[in-house]
Amino acid sequence: MAYDVIVKGAKAVRKGGTERADIAVKDGKIALIGPGIDENAEQVVQADGMYVFPGAVDCHVHFNEPGREEWEGIETGSNMLAAGGCTSYFDMPLNCIPSTVTAENLLAKAEIAERKSAVDFALWGGLMPGYTEHIRPMAEAGAIGFKAFLSKSGTDEFQSADERTLLKGMKEIAACGKVLALHAESDALTRFLEAEYALQGKIDVRAYASSRPEEAECEAVQRAIEYARATGCALHFVHISTKRAVLSIQQAKKDGLDVTVETCPHYLLFSFEDFLKKGAAAKCAPPLRSEADKEELIGVLAEGLIDMVSSDHSPCHPSLKREDNMFLSWGGISGGQFTLLGMIQLAIDHGIPFEHVARWTAEAPAKRFGLTNKGRLEEGFDADFAIVRPEPFTVTKETMFSKHKQSLYEGHTFPYRIAATYSKGRCVYQDGGRKQSGAFGTFLKPSEIKEPIL
């Protein structure tokens, strides 16, 4: 058989471990994995000494289109992800205008992404007051799941879910067999603390971080878990930043609830000290935690208590990253390009096998959200993979692919670099630049088969 692509001599990072193997691609699928594949191919990639990881599945990005393309946009955002070894992403329903809270809005965004996205994509629908009747139509239109905020979202267009909206929405989402992703921070506690600091005239990094303490995350997580018991709704907790919240979620799993949890590289690689040094570029919600909190989070990740890692790429125009008032500064990290590299660094630093990195960044999100042909280097799966070279990579403005070159990661050096990224057998990134320009992404809709709890 003649193949389209053969990657030769690499170490393939697979579910059972890392093995030296060639990978043959035909018609966008992995056709064969094994040693010494000698058949002809249109393209032969010599990858001796390199690793091949499954293409990352980033279940949490904000590309802000339509309506706020000046913040990022689907074209620049998807090419940025490709430069980081990511071959599928789930775009969140907020920061765009209009918010993705109706089937009409969801399909309009999908049409834009089909024209602009370099890699495959899925779309979250939004759970927002006044829009619960749109949940089923969005599910039928292909929403990967639904997203709600338990505290203010940061944009006027996407309101946080009050208790009635949350409970009504959870019942409907459960009836549709979908998953609700939650930004879990207590609205009451964060608003109270923010007002207290405002009265004292405290608006700096320390005040902002103190206004969103561990207790705010843990209270919201526990309340959502109890609501899940009452409604039967499957939950996915996004960007969890503390060990205590992770342990609450694990207890819910032991109790039989259908819940999963993600964290983000910035909570694993950086700490509050970096927030003090970097300022607004490092502002996010929840905020970066203490060094001790970071080490505890790494510990529960290494123990297998966190299901997956996503970027929560949430950029903005640099003018919104205000240094004079941290409460008014945009809260979001521009970091989608660095998730896979960050997790490889973490694995090297802590002696964690690379197959765990593949699970966190690819297999687990694909499985959780019903993408049955994604997330693993297996015959018959989509030929989505990243070739990674063990050579240092320093983040500079010149090596960032996001629209705006402002990031917490600037100046950071990773031990490995992305040599190339393939989406369905097509090279969409090669070290130093885009390989094939154009929009090759397709709209991913979840399988009807409901996977078991991870």
Curated annotation (Swiss-Prot):
Catalytic activities: (S)-allantoin + H2O = allantoate + H(+)
One Pfam family matching this protein: Amidohydro_1
PANTHER family on file: ALLANTOINASE
Subunit comment: Homotetramer.
Name recorded for this polypeptide: Allantoinase
Naturally occurring in which organism (per UniProt): Bacillus velezensis (strain DSM 23117 / BGSC 10A6 / LMG 26770 / FZB42) (Bacillus amyloliquefaciens subsp. plantarum)
GO molecular function per UniProt: allantoinase activity; cobalt ion binding; zinc ion binding
Cofactor(s) needed for function: Zn(2+)
HAMAP family from the UniProt entry: Hydantoinase
Co-factor: note: Binds 2 Zn(2+) ions per subunit.
